[in-house]
Regions:
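Short, surface-exposed amphipathic charged segments that create phosphate/polyanion-binding patches used
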Residues: 84-91, 145-148, 230-233
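A structural signal for short hydrophobic beta-strand segments in well-ordered beta-sheet cores
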Residues: 25, 149-151, 215
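Conserved catalytic core of nucleotide-sugar-dependent glycosyltransferases
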Residues: 141-157
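Catalytic-core segments of class I nucleotidyltransferases/pyrophosphorylases
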Residues: 111, 120-124, 153-224, 228-253
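Conserved N-terminal catalytic core of the sugar/cofactor nucleotidyltransferase
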Residues: 2-5, 13, 27, 31-107, ...
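Conserved donor-nucleotide/metal-binding helix-loop-beta segment in metal-dependent transferases, i.e.
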Residues: 114-143
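Short alpha-helical oligomerization interface
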Residues: 19-24
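A short acidic, often aromatic-flanked loop/helix-cap motif at beta-alpha or helix-coil junctions
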Residues: 77-82, 140, 166, 222-224
């Protein structure tokens, strides 16, 4: 299995912090966010590909130094205006690293409690299928900011709607995906058909019309870090786990 960790965005909502530091390298609980994500990914594979942009490729290269099995890919973009988009970045890595294996895709700015080993075990029981992690956010207003999924009793995903104005449920897709090796070439087909290259949930929505996709429900902590409030909340949650006092404002200092 290959893993692709998405870290090529420009995190404009976190400026000025992200003018000089990639969001995924900001410290959470005293460690770069990517450390926590990569620790999780290493539960299931040692073939890890991090895709980032030209602005921060050197920083990610230094971060990866000493981490066995981690390859950093520079997608060549330099600003939010010329970014490839998450799905474009997945295709970029597959072109460089090959597309002949099962694929785990995970966002580098998502922190969570569940075990990726459990996610993989769940997915392997479904045969030739892909899977997405799903979480009950518990609030219809909050659900408008995410992709809302409809899941059958057997866990098969029946529907997906990206950021609906009137969500039908509070069950949302989170940014962890497993693609069977037979489905991986469909990433290129999705893009070749002219579909949007951003928001990986759109790929799942498209895939539903072609192949079976299952939803893995999880509980516990989950942070999709996109703004200063979420960054501070995640930092304080991880600091508390380490026995450190909470902060009123976020700081990159330990």
């Amino acid at each position: 299995m290959k893993a692709v960790i998405l870290a090529a965005g420009y995190a404009t909502r976190l400026r000025p912090l992200t003018d000089s530091i990639a969001k995924q390298l900001l410290p959470i609980g005293g460690r770069p966010m990517m450390d926590w994500v990569c620790d999780k990914v290493e539960e299931v594979t040692g073939d890890i590909h991090v895709v980032t942009n030209a602005r921060f490729a050197g920083d990610f290269g230094r971060w990866a130094n000493g981490r066995e099995g981690v390859t950093v890919h520079d997608d060549g973009t330099t600003s939010n205006d010329d970014r490839l988009g998450a799905i474009g970045d997945i295709a970029f890595v597959l072109d460089r690293a090959g597309s002949d294996d099962d694929l785990l895709v995970i966002a580098g700015d998502n922190l969570f409690d569940f075990s990726l080993s459990d996610f993989v075990e769940f997915w392997r029981t479904k045969g030739v299928a892909s899977a997405v992690t799903v979480y009950d956010c518990g609030d219809l207003e909050l659900a408008t900011h995410y992709g809302v999924v409809e899941v059958a009793e057997d866990d098969r995903v029946l529907g997906f709607e990206e950021k609906p104005s009137e969500p039908r449920s509070t069950l949302v897709a989170t940014a962890s995906y497993l693609y069977h090796r037979d489905h991986v070439p469909l990433v290129g087909r999705y893009l070749a058909e002219g579909n949007p290259p951003d928001q990986p949930g759109r790929l799942i929505a498209w895939l539903l019309g072609h192949e079976p996709v299952y939803g893995y429900r999880f509980t516990g902590a989950w942070f999709d870090i996109g703004n200063p409030e979420q960054l501070l909340e995640a930092d304080n949650r991880w600091r508390a786990r380490l026995g450190h006092p909470p902060r009123e404002t976020y700081s990159t200092l330990s």
